[in-house]
Amino acid sequence: MRIELRSWSSIAFLFTLFIAYVVSESNFKPDIKLTKEGEIAKEYNYFDDSSNILVLRKDKLAISFDDGVSWKNVKETENERVIRYQFDPFNNNRAFAFTIDKFQYVTNDKGETWSKFEIYDPKNEKEHLTLNSIPHILFNAKNPDLAIFVVYHCPEDKKISNQCVNYHFLTTDGFKSNPKSLQTDASICTFAKSTKSYDVGKDETIYCSRNKLNSFGHIVESYIVASDDFFKTESKINHALAKSGSIIDIRVLQNFAIVVVQNDKFNTKSKVSLLVSKDGKNFNEADLKVDISYGIMTFLESSSSSIFLAVMDYSNSFRKFSLSTVYSSDSSGLSFSKVLDKVQGGSIQKVETIDGVWLANIADEIKDNKGKSKTLLDMLMGGGIDKNIKSRISYNDGEDWNLLKINNDGSCTTESECSLHLLNPTEKSGDGKFVTGPTPGILLSVGNKGSKLEKDINRMNTWISRDGGISWDFALDEPCLFSFGDQGNIIVAIPYYGKNKMNSSNMYFSLDQGKSWENVALEIPIFPLTLTTTVDGTSQRFILSGLIDSTPKDKADYSFAETLYAIDFSKAFGGKKCDSKKDFEDIYTRLDPSNDKPICIYGHKEKFRRRKQNSQCFVNELFEDVKVYDDPCECTVIDFECASGFSRSKEKECKPDKKKLANICRDKKSKKISLPDKALASGNKCKNPKEAAKEFVKTKEFKCSDYLDEDDKDKNKGNKHDIVSTFNEFDSELQQYTYVEQGETYSGENIILRTKANVAYASNNGGVEFVKIPVSDEIVTYYPGLVPGQVILITDSEKFYFSIDGGNTFQKKTAPAKPNVIGARIISFDKKDTEKFIWYSSENCDNPFSRDCSLVAYITEDGGENFQKLKEDVRSCDFVADVFEDVSDEIKNMIYCTVEDKSSRKLMLLSSTDYFKQSKKVFDNVVGYAITGNFLVAATIDDAEQSLKAKVTVDGQIFADADFPPDFHVDSQQAYTVLDSASKAIFIHVTTNNENGHEFGSILKSNSNGTSYSLTLDKVNRNRIGYVDYDRIEGIEGVIVSNIVANDHSKDRKKLKTQITHNDGGEWSYITPPVIDSKGKKYKCNGKSLSKCSLNLHGFTERADYRDTFSSASAIGLMMAVGNVGEYLEDFDKCSTFISRDGGITWKEIKKGVYMWEYGDRGTILVLVNAEKTTDKLMYSLDEGDTWHDYKFAEEPIDVLDLATVPSDTSRKFLIFGKSDRKMVSYSIDFTNIHKRQCQLDLDNPNDDDFEYWSPTHPSTPDNCLFGREAKYLRRAIGHDDCFIGSAPLIEGFKVTRNCSCTRKDYECDYNFFRDSDDTCKLVKGLSPSNRKKEMCKKENAFEYFEPTGYRKIPLSTCVGGKNFDTWKVHPCPGKQKEFNKHHGKELNSGSLLAVIGIPIAVFLLATWFVYERGIRRNGGFKRFGQIRLDLDDDDFHPIENNEVDKAINKIVKGGIVIVAASIAGFKTLRKVDRMLFDKVTSSLFRRRPGHRNYVHVPEMDEEEELFGNFRDNYEEELEEGTNNINEDFNDEPNDYEYEEETNDEVDSRLFNIDDQSDEELQSATPEDN
C-alpha cells in the first residue's frame, strides 16, 4: 500500500506539474524590447542566416546584431550619405552600401566590418565618377569574386538625354580592389550564371547588348555580344529582330536566357518580343501572341520547365491596379499559352516551397451594378472598371483554377459559389520581399468569405491554411499584418489598425500553427509598418515597427516618429526542442481535394516533415531551410508538351499550327514532313518516359502544299499565316464608333463604339477585343474631346460618364440638367484642358419650335464635379483662345457664343473672357461662325443689302472684312462653307446655285491674313447639307481634288468632272488617266483631249464615312480612290478602284469594282475590302500597291459596313465592321507579325538604310520645284518591302534642298481678277484693281507698296528672285518717303552724286583712252576700221597682239565693230517703219501711256519661246503695260461669270461649324449615315 500510495502520489505530482506547465504556457508572453526612433526608417532587412539587421534612416546606415534589440550606426559610413544598400543573393555574408560621394562600401562578414572602394570616371581615370543615379550590382551565382557595378550616368547639364549611358565596372576579387571599367559600350549586361540553375558557359561569361547610334541619337543597330574574358575578345550573337529593334533587357531566369526586344525602337510604348536561349548561343523568338510593352510585362517566379509572366493592362490611368493576363511557356521557353486573364492588378502569387501552386484574384463583371457610384477602392480593385474580385487557386501550375474552400462551414461551400477571397496572402520576408512564407504549407492571409472580395477592409478577417492554400480556417477577427517563425510554428500578427481605425494597441501570436491565438498588449500603440523575421523564417525572434504621433497634443500636426519592438519567443515551451521521431509528421503537398491524393507536377510529387500541430516544442533548427523530398511519378500525358509544328488549343490538345508547319516546310524544302505531336517536357522527372511516349505521342504526316501558297517565294506578300483575324459579335447594329487618340495618360489603340440599342463598348487593343462598358444607363451618344484620351458618354438623364484615358476608365458625373433635346451639340471641349468643357441643356422645349424653348450653356472646370451657368438662349459656344497664335492673358479664357435675341429672333455673336459675367456684342446679326486653323470666320447678315458678309479675326478681338470678289453677292438665304486653312490661306465654298439636286458654287481662296479673296475654282459640286467635293491631300502641300459640275446650265442630273491642283489652287487641271486597266486593256483615250477623257473620282459628298479620305498624312504621296476613266464621273456600279504613288500625278487601276481602302504603317500596308458585295476576303499590298494579295478573314461572307484603322494610319491593325445574319460583327485584322524587322533609318548614311528621298512636283515643271522650293520627303525605298516603318522619325529627314527662282507657278490671281481659260489672270469686267497700300504699309518696318499686277504670290511659296509677277510699280508708304528714297537711291547728296555719276564717267574715259591707245591707234587708227567690211570673216583683220592684254583689248575692239554695225543696221531698218507704229512702240515702252490690254498672258515655260520669242527678256514691260491698262473697260467682251442667285432655301447654320469638314459629328460618323 505504501508503494501504491507513493505511485499515486507520483502521478498526482506529475499531473500537477503538467497542469502548471500548461497554465504557464497558456500565460506565456514573449520578451519584448521597445526602442523609440525620431526618424522613420526606409526599410529593415536581415542578412540571410543571421540575426544581423540593416536599417537606413535619414541616409544613415545602422545595424543590429541581436535581432533588433540594440542598434548602432555603421562607423565606417558615419560621415557618408548612404542612399541605398543591397545584399548579395548568393553570398549571405556580403552586402553593399552606396553613397553619393566617391566611396562605396562592402561588408563580407554580415556587417561586422566594412571596407570601401572607389569608382573612377571611364573617360578620365584620375577623376571619381559623380553618381547622379542609384547604382546596383550584378552578381555571379557561381563565383562570388565576380561582380559588376552598374550606374546610369548623365552629364550634369543633361539629366535626361541620349548622352546618358550605363557604365559597367567589373571586379574579379570581390571588391578588394577598385572595380575597373568594363571595356564595352554596352547598354545592358548580365552574367550568364546569374542563377544557380543556369549552367551554361564559363563563370566569366557575360552577355551584353550594344546599340549603335547615329548623330541624331537614334539606334541604328542593336545586337547581343558575349565574352568569356571580360571583352578582350567577344562574339556577336546576331538576330534579325534584335538588329532592327532595340534591346531593352537581358536577364537570366532559372535556366532561360531572355532578351527583351522593343520591336519599334522609336516608340517606347510599342510591342516587345522575347528572344529565348537555353544554350546561351542560339536565341529564338518566342511566340507570345499578344501586344505587350515592356513597362507592363512582369516576369513571375518561374520554374526550370516554364517561364511565367504577367502582362498588365497599363492603358488606363490607374496603372498598376489594372487587370493582367498571365502566360506560361513550354520547357523550351518559346511557345506560350494563356494561363489566366482578368487578374486584378498584380494579385498573383506562387506559393513558396511548393511547385505548381498559385493564388490569384480574378475580376468578374458586375451584372447588378444598377448605376451605383464607385469608391476609389472600387476603381483600384477593379482596374478602373467595376468588377467583382474573386480568389482562385491552381495546384497544377495554372492548368485549372478553383475556388478557395473554407473548412467546417456548411453555410459557405464552393458548390454554392461561396468561398474565401483573399486581399493579400503575403508577408514581408527578412530580405524585403513579399512572399507567402518559407513554411511547409502554412499560409496566412487577410480576406473574407462570400461570393466576392469585399471592398471595405473593415469587413475582412485573417485566415489560415495548413495545406498550401487549398482549404482555409478562420484565424482572427481583424485584418492583420503577419510573419512566420520556426518554420511556421510561431505566427505573429498585428491588426492594421485598432478600434475606431485608431492605432493598434495589441498583437496576436500562435504557437500551434494558428489553432489558437494569444493576445499581447503593446506598451505604445502604433500604426504598424513592418513585421518581419529572418529570411528563412526559422528564427524565434521578430521585429515590429510602427508609427506614433510625435506631437499628440497638436491635432492638426502630421509629425510622426517610429517605435520599434524586438520580440523574442525563445523561452516558450521552456526552450524545448522537438523530438525528430515523436513530434513530426510527413506532409505531401498539392493534395487533390476530391481524394486527398498528391498531385504530380513536372513528373514528381513532394513531401516534407512538419512539426505536429499540438506538439509543444520548437524545431529550433536556426537557419536550416525547410527540406523538400521528391518522389518521381509515373509518366502521364500531362508530362508531355506540344512538339515543334503544333500548338496547344483551348481544349488543351496539340493541334497542327499552320504558321509553324509552313516555316518547317520552308526550312526543310520538302513536299512532305512527318512530325511527332508531343515531346516530354525538358526537366520532367517522371518515370518510364519512353514507354509513356509510345502511348501518348502520335506521329503525323503533312503535305507542304497545304501550308505553302504557290507564290510562297513572293517576298512582297509576306506570310499570310502571320496575319491574325479576330472575330467579335455585338448585340445590335452599329450606330457610331471612334478611335480615341493616344495620350500621355494612356496608350493603346482605343475604340469607343455604340450600337443602336444604346449600349457602349470599348476596346484598348485596336478592336481585337471589345468589352461592354459596365454602366446601367442607355448611352444615347458620346463625344470624343479635343485632348487625347478625353471621352464623354451621354445618357438621357443628367448622368454622364467622363474619361480622360481613352475609355479605359469612366467616372460617373451629374450635369446640372438633362442634355438638350433640340438636336444641338451637347458638349463643347477646351483644346487643352481635359477638365474644362461646356454642357448644353434645354429648357421649355417640349415643343422644340416654341419661342420659349431655350438652349442653356453650363461650364465646368473640374471634369463635371461642379457646373456654373454660362449663358441662356445660346445656339453654340466655343473656347477660342487657343485657336489664335498669340494668346495673351487677357483672352486666355475667351469664349464665343451665338445667342438668340428673343425679341428680334436674330442671332448675335457675343464674346466673354470671364464666363459671361461680362460680355461683348461682336455682331448683332449672324448666321454662325466657323473655326479653321488660326482663323475665326463669322457669317454676318447685312440687313440693308440682304446679303451674307464674312468677317475674319486672327486674335479674337479685331475683325476684318473678308473681301469677296464684288460679283459674289451672297444672299442672306444662301450659304458658304469654310473648307480649311491648312496652307496659311482660308478656302471658302460660296454657293452660287442652291437649286435642289443641282447645288454647286465657287471656291474662293484668301490671302495670308484671310481678308482678301479671289476665285480659285468655279462650279464646284456640293450636296444638300452643304458638304463640298473638296479633298486636301494630306502629307503633301498644295494638292487638292475637287469635282466640278460640267452641265451647270442644265436641269439634267449633274455631270461631274474631277480636277486637281498641285499648287494650292493656283492652277487646276483634269487628272491624266492610266493607259491600261487592271486587266491590261487600254483605255479608249487615244486621240482625245484631257477634257474629253480623264480620270474622274467620287468625292467627299458621296462618302458613307467622311473620315475616309483619298490620302493619309503619314503615307506621303499615296492616294486611293474610286472612279472611272471617261468624260464624266459614272455611277459606282461602273467604277473601279485606283491608286497613285506620286500625289495624284499618275494613277493605276487596282481592281474593277468599288472597294473601301485603308492605309497602315504609313502606307507600307494597304488594305482593300469590297464595298458592294458580301465578302469573306480582303486584298492587301505590302509594296505600296504594286502587287495585291487575297486574305480570307472570315469563315463566311459578310456585308462590310466599314474598314477602319487609327486616324494617323500608323497602326498595323485594321478593323472591319459588317453584318452577318442580321448581327453586327467586327473582325480585327492584325498585320503586326507580317514584317520581321523594322526598316532601318540612318540619317547619317541615307544610302545605306531602307528609305529614299522623294520630291513632290507639279506635273508641268521638270525641276522638282513646288511652292518655290525643292522639298524632299523620306519614304520607304522601293524593293524594301520586308520591313515596317513604325514610329521612325521621318520628319527629321525632311529637308528643303534649295529655294527656287520664282516662276508663274508661284502666283495666283489677285483680288478682283479671275483665271481665264487661257490660264491668265484677267480683271473682272467693270472693276478696278484693289489698292494694296493699306495692306502692305501696315506691316512692321514697311516703307513701300506696289500697284497690283493681277497676280499675287501663293502664301505657301518661298521662291526667291526669278520673275516677280506681283510687284512692279512701287510707291512710298505715307510718311516713308525718306526711307523709300534711301532704299531706291533717290536721295542723292554730293558724295553719292560723285559715286553714282562721277566715278563711272571717270572709269569710262580711262577705259576708252586705254582701248584707243592699245587697240585702235597702233592698229592703224579709225581709217583702218573704215576699211572693214561687215560681211567678211575675221581673217581680214589681223591686229597687233604681243601679250594677253593685247588679246583682250582686241576682242573688245572686234566686239565694238559688231555693235556699231548692228546699231547702224537697226537704225536704217527703223527708218523704214511707219512713224505712227514707231511712236506707239516708244510710248508704250517709255511713256506708259494707256493702251488696249487689260490682262497679261504668261505662257507655260515650254510655250514661251515659241509664242513670244524674247518675252523673258521683256516681261517687265509686258507687266508694266498690263498694269497701266487694266482700267480699260471693253463692252464687247462677254462676261462668262454671271450667276443666278437662288433664295428659296433657308440657310443651314451648321455649315458655319464645319472645320475641315470634320466636326464632332464627323468624329463619330456612322457608316450608314448620309
Swiss-Prot record:
Q: Does the keyword Transmembrane apply?
A: yes
> Ranges in the Lumenal compartment?
25-1390
List, as start-end ranges, the regions of compositional bias called Acidic residues: 1529-1546, 1556-1570
Matches recorded under PANTHER family: SORTILIN RELATED (PTHR12106), SORTILIN-RELATED RECEPTOR (PTHR12106:SF27)
Q: What span is annotated as the signal peptide, if there is one?
A: 1-24
- One Pfam family cited in the UniProt record for this chain: Sortilin_C
Q: Gene behind this chain?
A: VPS10
* Protein keywords: Glycoprotein, Golgi apparatus, Membrane, Protein transport, Receptor, Repeat, Signal, Transmembrane, Transmembrane helix, Transport
Topology of the protein relative to the lipid bilayer? Single-pass type I membrane protein
Output the Gene Ontology cellular-component terms. Answer: cytosol; Golgi apparatus; membrane
Q: Which residues lie on this side of the membrane: Cytoplasmic?
A: 1412-1570
Query: What is this protein identified as?
Result: Vacuolar protein sorting/targeting protein 10
Q: What does this protein do?
A: Functions as a sorting receptor in the Golgi compartment required for the intracellular sorting and delivery of soluble vacuolar proteins, like carboxypeptidase Y (CPY) and proteinase A. Executes multiple rounds of sorting by cycling between the late Golgi and a prevacuolar endosome-like compartment.
